């Protein structure tokens, strides 16, 4: 299992990466916009900090997500993992990007069944929403156990 820090706060990232316990960063356009910075500037700063695996979320319909994912993958190379939502379009994008040898992280995972669909679509990673699972009276850590058995 790998642990990813979900933030766009580069000071926080730098602090936690010094522990050698964090394997990568996930972020999304909303987090980056809240920081008032350009997403690609943030991605480049993270790469310059030595972070090897950055999940870069794409949004929109199938075509928009696929084209943006391909563009980011080409621009940032091995450091880029494209993050897509676990929606019908997101899973289709995952499958197509995976066929293009692009690493994909499927987010908005609330069940083991969704993790199976993401794996079938070629996802390298899945991002379960443990906090929201716990908020809905389920046990989030059980979801992690189920997903780790699958992967």
Model-identified regions with their sequence ranges:
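Catalytic alpha/beta core domains of metabolic enzymes, predominantly
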Residues: 88-94, 105, 110-151
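Conserved dinucleotide-binding and phosphotransfer motif residues
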Residues: 100
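Active-site beta->alpha loop and helix N-cap motifs at the rims of alpha/beta catalytic domains
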Residues: 3-5, 9-14, 19-21, 27-96, ...
